[in-house]
Every structure is written in structure tokens, then in C-alpha cells.
Amino acid sequence: MNSQDLKKRQEKIRNFSIIAHIDHGKSTLADRILEKTETVSSREMQAQLLDSMDLERERGITIKLNAIELNYTAKDGETYIFHLIDTPGHVDFTYEVSRSLAACEGAILVVDAAQGIEAQTLANVYLALDNDLEILPVINKIDLPAADPERVRHEVEDVIGLDASEAVLASAKAGIGIEEILEQIVEKVPAPTGDVDAPFQALIFDSVYDAYRGVILQVRIVNGIVKPGDKIQMMSNGKTFDVTEVGIFTPKAVGRDFLATGDVGYVAASIKTVADTRVGDTVTLANNPAKEALHGYKQMNPMVFAGIYPIESNKYNDLREALEKLQLNDASLQFEPETSQALGFGFRCGFLGLLHMDVIQERLEREFNIDLIMTAPSVVYHVHTTDEDMIEVSNPSEFPDPTRVAFIEEPYVKAQIMVPQEFVGAVMELSQRRRGDFVTMDYIDDNRVNVIYQIPLAEIVFDFFDKLKSSTRGYASFDYDMSEYRRSQLVKMDILLNGDKVDALSFIVHKEFAYERGKIIVEKLKKIIPRQQFEVPIQAAIGQKIVARSDIKALRKNVLAKCYGGDVSRKRKLLEKQKAGKKRMKAIGSVEVPQEAFLSVLSMDDDTKK
């Protein structure tokens, strides 16, 4: 094809993704679009739905490799090339969405006709607006008995500020309104800009590891053209590779002769190591490189850290390989080796949020069959020392000596909670118990309220979402983003077993709650840790000061069983002998700490914060 033909073809390309709150019908709509454009035959559709979707539902990972090319013949008789870029995985927190949106010009916003706008809908819309995308509102599930499309239309206009007068009323399940959606994509989503004749530039928005072909990049071509035999170069590290294959997904991988400006597809170039490619990097040609990198999606910094240790220590190398493979698809996962006296060798991992942490843990256990121990998640604190240094600390065991600390700052998030009016009291009570500061409250409609709080991230990290759901009978939806660092009265609490610090049980706590929290943890550990042959004191300490203590009584054999009657001094001698043995045992004995003990430090019953 000459450049004239390629430019004509480019005008027919439409790149879009579907954004929606969970369960508003994103996947069903994607399936209907695949069916309507005859990308997948109805026979395969059934199989694909069952296979990929179950997996995606269950594990929160993407369908195959998530950019699908469709051909659609519009009412004007022209055939258009659509690229549906599925927002990967759960869109529970926005970290994955941003990279899909960076490859699009338009987004279909799906809103449930019965439930209306939810917190994550808003978060994703703002992301799409930041990327200057054309947003097409679709009000889905209009065939539900509780559907109220007009109310939702007003919500979209009032809350988001989008013109919803032309919003498509659809039911993905029943196949209503699908054609209208496709026509709107043709009319309203702009064709990709970019120049076929310019030096080749492509944005990597995902990648996957194939045991035979190495790392396969998923790219959006911004300028120029790429074909097998070209030598490509990564702009972040200058490494070069020979392209062996390019192609598109339909959802199966289909090889092509070339990929040109505006295309979304894959590039295989025998890239062996995971570290050579990063999502968000720019690819160009080695012999005619582009002048500058694309401003891709921004690198996200981890907000939550936790230690991951294999239960069987000989699985350490397997765990490293598994983390490297996961990191390939997930540029935001960070890890570095660490050792713990209690748990042996493992890794300190950084995650973007709790959902991210759960998904990674689940994938490690399922896909790689590694049994893990996770330590308590913690956040990044800014510790200012007396010699005017600022240290970033994400692991409680790295906290400097309390005498060197001038003050500590902790991250706060802006939490947006949407909830029916009757539960506003419960939400405010929970947020205040978690040291939240009230910011504002808006009514979305007669019944639903958007409450905004500033809450320390450390208070959200563990079970805030579960508590929120249970106190609002599951009606609340919640989203948060980083706000700022603030000074706080924080202290590090150590747990001592038999006089020894257990590094994996240390945690950071607000001074106000330290005493109660120490007391509760000590009592919990007393119930969980099995009794030993000797007495074990459990202590909670801040610096040198012990704030709580509880003892696990020793198991003891009845050494007097064989003394029938007899002299009291004989009995005393046996008891003294037992006591000396216990004392010796205590001096050298170490205490086995079961996995539940690490988790119990986390699941603080809420009565600690009343």
C-alpha cells in the first residue's frame, strides 16, 4: 500500500474503549459488539464467553490480549476498522484504565439504568477527559423492571456535565441499541491523528510473555509504519530488537504484513527478558529513530507495600520468576528482595492499591502454585529526622530510632463515597473512626449522596472497603486518589515474644490508639500461638516502653503422678527439677508463629477505634 492508501485507511480507523463501574454491563456489551460486527461467529461466541469471561470474572485479568480489531460496515456503505481496547482486568481502581485510554480516541461510558452513576464511573470519566477522549454515554439495562433511563440521563448531565441528550438507550443482554452505538462510534469518535510518513513511533500499552516467542508487545502505532524485519529500539533504554512478527487480535492473534499509523496490534521481536520492556515506553526504528518519546501513560508509584514470603523456603527462586512474569504485564508492580528473621527470605512488594495486592496474591497462588505468607500492608511514610534528613519508609522494620525522629508525615487520600441517604450517618461514623476529615457532601438526586473525606491511607489499607460495604448493606461505592502528606503523631509498635522482637509483626500506629491496639493484639496472639513447654510472655512495646503484656502459660507434665503419698520434700525436689528444666528451655527455646498471627495484626476489630 502506498502512503495515499494508508492515509485513506487511517481515516476509517476508530479506536475506543468501554468504561463502566463493575457489573454495569461492560463485558456483555463488548460481546454484543463482537457478535454484531461478526468478528466472532455465534458458535465461537458461546465458547469464548464461557472460557475467557469466567477467567476474567474470577481472576480479574484481561481477555486474551485485550485489543480486538473489528470491521463494521456502516449505514453510509463504508467499512470502518474498529479497535476495541478492553480496559484490562478489574477497573476497580483506575491504575489499569489509564494505559488503555492512552491508546484510544473515544470511550463508551456505560451506566446502569437502574443504579445510575457510581464512584468508579466518575473516576474513569475524569481519566477519559484528561486524555481528551470523545465520550459516548450509553444507558444500559433499560429492560430491567427498576430501570429509570430519564433519571440516569439527568444524572449524567448534572454530575458529570456531559450532554446526554443523544445517549443511547441500550440493553446489551437483549441486544437492544447495539447498532446505534456502532453508528455513534463512526460519527463521533475522531480518526487517529498521526503521519504515516513520519519516523515510526508506537506506545506500548501492555505486554505478555510467551514461552516460545519471548515478550510480545501490545502497541498503538502513533506515527509511521512497522513490518517484520525492521530493527526496533526502546526509547527508555536504547535496546534494539529485530521484529519477527506483527499482527492484530480478532480475539485470536492474526499475523499481518505491516502495522501503520492508528493501528492497534502486537509486535513480537524475540525479546527475552522482562526488564527490557516497560508499559508506557515508546518504540521506534533503530535506523530512523523518532526525536522524542511519546508522553505515554504516567508511571504510577506504589502506594501500599507488603512482604511476600514463600511458606516453603526452597520456593524462593520460583517466587522471583513468578513476580518477574507478573511484572511484565503490570509495570506498576515493584519488588525487591528482603529477609526477615521470622519468615526467612522473601520480597518487599509495592502495589497501587488493595485490589491490586489481592489480584497479585491470587495470581501467584493460582497460576504459579506458590503458597505465600503476606505481612501486614503498610504505606510510605516520610520520616523527618533531627539532622534534617527526610527518609521514605515503607517497611516498619526500617523505621529509625525514635530518638532521631523529629516528625513523621503520612499520606492522605481523598475518598469519594457514594451512598443512599439513609446510610450517610454510618459512612460518616466509619470515616471519623478512621481519623477522616470531612470535606464536603453533595446530593446527586433525591436519594443518593456523594460524601468526600480526607482519610489517612493507612486507615483504608486493610479492611475499610469491607467495613464500608457491611455498614451500608453493600450499597456504597468507593473510590480514592492520593491527596497529600500531612504531619501525624505516629509511633512504631514492636511485638516481643519471649523477649525477642518479631520483625514481621511490627506496625505503625497513631499515638492515640497505640495503647488499645497493643492490648488487643497481645490478647489475640495469646489465643493464636500454641502453648509451649515453657511460659511465653507476649509484649507490645513502643521504643523501650512496654505498653501491654500477656503470658501464654506453659504446658506441664504432672511430675507428681508417681508419688503416692510420701514426703513433701520429695515432691518439692521433683517440682524444682521441672522448674529448672523449663527455665533452661525458655532461655534457648524459640516460638513457632503460625500464619494467622500475622493476619491478626491486621484485622483489628473496630472496637479498637471507638
Swiss-Prot record:
GO terms for biological process: positive regulation of translation. Its EC number is 3.6.5.n1. SUPFAM superfamilies: EF-G C-terminal domain-like, P-loop containing nucleoside triphosphate hydrolases, Translation proteins. It catalyses: GTP + H2O = GDP + phosphate + H(+). Required for accurate and efficient protein synthesis under certain stress conditions. May act as a fidelity factor of the translation reaction, by catalyzing a one-codon backward translocation of tRNAs on improperly translocated ribosomes. Back-translocation proceeds from a post-translocation (POST) complex to a pre-translocation (PRE) complex, thus giving elongation factor G a second chance to translocate the tRNAs correctly. Binds to ribosomes in a GTP-dependent manner. Residues 11-193 form the tr-type G domain. It is found in: Cell membrane. One of its GO terms (cellular component) is plasma membrane. It is an enzyme of class 3 (hydrolase). SMART domains: EFG_C (SM00838). It comes from Streptococcus pyogenes serotype M49 (strain NZ131). It is a peripheral membrane protein. It holds the Pfam family GTP_EFTU. It comes from the Bacteria. InterPro entries: EF-4, EFG_II, EFG_III/V, EFG_V-like, EFTu-like_2, G_TR_CS, LepA_C_sf, LepA_CTD. GO terms for molecular function: GTP binding; GTPase activity; ribosome binding; translation elongation factor activity. GTP binds at D23, H24, G25, K26, S27, T28, N140, K141, I142, D143. Keywords: Cell membrane, GTP-binding, Hydrolase, Membrane, Nucleotide-binding, Protein biosynthesis. Belongs to the TRAFAC class translation factor GTPase superfamily. Classic translation factor GTPase family. LepA subfamily. This is Elongation factor 4. PROSITE patterns: G_TR_1 (PS00301), G_TR_2 (PS51722).
